[in-house]
Amino acid sequence: MIQQESRLKVADNTGAKEILCIRVLGGSSRRYAGIGDVIVATVKDAIPGGNVKRGDVVKAVVVRTAKERRRADGSYIKFDENAAVIIKNDNDPRGTRIFGPVGRELREKKFMKIVSLAPEVL
Protein backbone atom coordinates (compact mmCIF):
# COMPACT_ATOMS: atom_id res chain seq x y z
CA MET A 1 0.00 0.00 0.00
CA ILE A 2 1.49 3.24 -1.19
CA GLN A 3 0.20 6.60 0.04
CA GLN A 4 1.38 10.20 0.00
CA GLU A 5 4.96 10.64 1.24
CA SER A 6 5.81 6.96 0.58
CA ARG A 7 9.27 6.44 -0.89
CA LEU A 8 9.74 3.83 -3.62
CA LYS A 9 12.72 2.37 -5.43
CA VAL A 10 12.76 2.88 -9.20
CA ALA A 11 12.91 -0.41 -11.12
CA ASP A 12 14.03 0.92 -14.52
CA ASN A 13 17.02 2.56 -16.19
CA THR A 14 15.74 6.16 -16.43
CA GLY A 15 18.44 7.34 -14.02
CA ALA A 16 16.18 7.83 -11.00
CA LYS A 17 16.97 5.71 -7.95
CA GLU A 18 14.24 6.79 -5.52
CA ILE A 19 10.91 8.61 -5.85
CA LEU A 20 8.45 10.07 -3.33
CA CYS A 21 4.72 9.69 -3.93
CA ILE A 22 2.89 13.01 -3.95
CA ARG A 23 -0.51 11.84 -5.26
CA VAL A 24 -2.41 8.60 -5.91
CA LEU A 25 -4.37 8.93 -9.16
CA GLY A 26 -7.90 7.57 -9.54
CA GLY A 27 -10.32 9.70 -7.54
CA SER A 28 -10.29 12.83 -5.44
CA SER A 29 -10.05 11.09 -2.07
CA ARG A 30 -8.17 7.92 -3.03
CA ARG A 31 -5.65 7.14 -0.32
CA TYR A 32 -3.74 3.96 -1.20
CA ALA A 33 -2.11 2.57 -4.34
CA GLY A 34 -1.31 -1.09 -4.94
CA ILE A 35 0.36 -3.04 -7.74
CA GLY A 36 -0.68 -1.65 -11.12
CA ASP A 37 -1.90 1.72 -9.81
CA VAL A 38 -0.57 5.01 -11.19
CA ILE A 39 0.90 7.66 -8.90
CA VAL A 40 2.41 11.12 -9.31
CA ALA A 41 5.85 11.32 -7.73
CA THR A 42 8.93 13.48 -7.44
CA VAL A 43 12.46 12.21 -8.01
CA LYS A 44 14.40 12.25 -4.73
CA ASP A 45 17.63 10.54 -5.83
CA ALA A 46 19.05 10.19 -9.34
CA ILE A 47 22.33 9.35 -11.05
CA PRO A 48 24.14 12.03 -13.06
CA GLY A 49 23.44 12.00 -16.79
CA GLY A 50 20.13 10.16 -16.54
CA ASN A 51 16.87 10.87 -18.37
CA VAL A 52 15.30 12.35 -15.22
CA LYS A 53 16.81 14.73 -12.70
CA ARG A 54 16.32 15.20 -8.98
CA GLY A 55 13.20 17.30 -8.38
CA ASP A 56 11.39 16.25 -11.57
CA VAL A 57 7.68 15.47 -11.18
CA VAL A 58 6.86 12.18 -12.94
CA LYS A 59 4.07 9.64 -13.32
CA ALA A 60 4.88 6.10 -12.22
CA VAL A 61 3.15 2.74 -11.96
CA VAL A 62 3.65 0.62 -8.83
CA VAL A 63 5.17 -2.79 -9.71
CA ARG A 64 6.07 -4.20 -6.25
CA THR A 65 4.67 -3.61 -2.75
CA ALA A 66 5.81 -4.89 0.62
CA LYS A 67 2.19 -5.14 1.79
CA GLU A 68 0.65 -8.48 0.82
CA ARG A 69 -2.16 -8.48 -1.74
CA ARG A 70 -4.86 -11.14 -1.94
CA ARG A 71 -5.57 -12.51 -5.39
CA ALA A 72 -8.80 -13.95 -6.76
CA ASP A 73 -7.59 -17.55 -6.35
CA GLY A 74 -6.96 -17.01 -2.63
CA SER A 75 -3.17 -16.75 -2.83
CA TYR A 76 -1.20 -13.79 -1.52
CA ILE A 77 1.69 -11.96 -3.16
CA LYS A 78 4.16 -9.64 -1.47
CA PHE A 79 7.67 -8.40 -2.18
CA ASP A 80 10.65 -7.27 -0.12
CA GLU A 81 10.37 -3.64 -1.21
CA ASN A 82 8.14 -1.00 -2.73
CA ALA A 83 9.12 -0.26 -6.34
CA ALA A 84 7.74 1.64 -9.32
CA VAL A 85 8.46 2.21 -13.02
CA ILE A 86 8.40 5.75 -14.43
CA ILE A 87 5.94 6.07 -17.32
CA LYS A 88 5.01 8.58 -20.03
CA ASN A 89 1.51 10.02 -20.40
CA ASP A 90 0.54 7.16 -22.77
CA ASN A 91 1.45 4.56 -20.07
CA ASP A 92 4.60 3.38 -21.88
CA PRO A 93 7.76 3.16 -19.74
CA ARG A 94 10.31 5.97 -20.10
CA GLY A 95 13.20 3.56 -19.65
CA THR A 96 14.24 0.68 -21.88
CA ARG A 97 14.91 -1.92 -19.16
CA ILE A 98 12.99 -3.15 -16.10
CA PHE A 99 14.84 -4.59 -13.09
CA GLY A 100 13.40 -7.28 -10.84
CA PRO A 101 10.08 -9.12 -10.89
CA VAL A 102 6.72 -7.40 -11.38
CA GLY A 103 3.21 -8.37 -10.29
CA ARG A 104 0.76 -10.17 -12.58
CA GLU A 105 -1.76 -7.39 -11.91
CA LEU A 106 0.08 -5.23 -14.46
CA ARG A 107 -1.10 -7.51 -17.26
CA GLU A 108 -4.74 -7.13 -16.16
CA LYS A 109 -4.35 -3.33 -16.08
CA LYS A 110 -2.97 -3.22 -19.65
CA PHE A 111 0.67 -2.31 -18.93
CA MET A 112 1.81 -4.82 -21.56
CA LYS A 113 5.05 -3.02 -22.47
CA ILE A 114 6.23 -3.19 -18.85
CA VAL A 115 5.25 -6.86 -18.60
CA SER A 116 7.17 -7.70 -21.79
CA LEU A 117 10.32 -5.89 -20.59
CA ALA A 118 10.27 -7.43 -17.10
CA PRO A 119 12.57 -10.41 -16.46
CA GLU A 120 9.90 -12.18 -14.37
CA VAL A 121 6.16 -11.83 -13.77
CA LEU A 122 4.90 -13.23 -10.45
From Swiss-Prot:
<comment type="function">
    <text>Binds to 23S rRNA. Forms part of two intersubunit bridges in the 70S ribosome.</text>
</comment>
<dbReference type="InterPro" id="IPR036853">
    <property type="entry name" value="Ribosomal_uL14_sf"/>
</dbReference>
<keyword id="KW-0687">Ribonucleoprotein</keyword>
<dbReference type="GO" id="GO:0003735">
    <property type="term" value="F:structural constituent of ribosome"/>
</dbReference>
<comment type="subunit">
    <text>Part of the 50S ribosomal subunit. Forms a cluster with proteins L3 and L19. In the 70S ribosome, L14 and L19 interact and together make contacts with the 16S rRNA in bridges B5 and B8.</text>
</comment>
<dbReference type="Pfam" id="PF00238">
    <property type="entry name" value="Ribosomal_L14"/>
</dbReference>
<protein>
    <recommendedName>
        <fullName>Large ribosomal subunit protein uL14</fullName>
    </recommendedName>
</protein>
<dbReference type="InterPro" id="IPR005745">
    <property type="entry name" value="Ribosomal_uL14_bac-type"/>
</dbReference>
<dbReference type="InterPro" id="IPR000218">
    <property type="entry name" value="Ribosomal_uL14"/>
</dbReference>
<comment type="similarity">
    <text>Belongs to the universal ribosomal protein uL14 family.</text>
</comment>
<dbReference type="InterPro" id="IPR019972">
    <property type="entry name" value="Ribosomal_uL14_CS"/>
</dbReference>
<dbReference type="GO" id="GO:0006412">
    <property type="term" value="P:translation"/>
</dbReference>
<keyword id="KW-0689">Ribosomal protein</keyword>
<keyword id="KW-0694">RNA-binding</keyword>
<keyword id="KW-0699">rRNA-binding</keyword>
<dbReference type="GO" id="GO:0070180">
    <property type="term" value="F:large ribosomal subunit rRNA binding"/>
</dbReference>
<dbReference type="GO" id="GO:0022625">
    <property type="term" value="C:cytosolic large ribosomal subunit"/>
</dbReference>
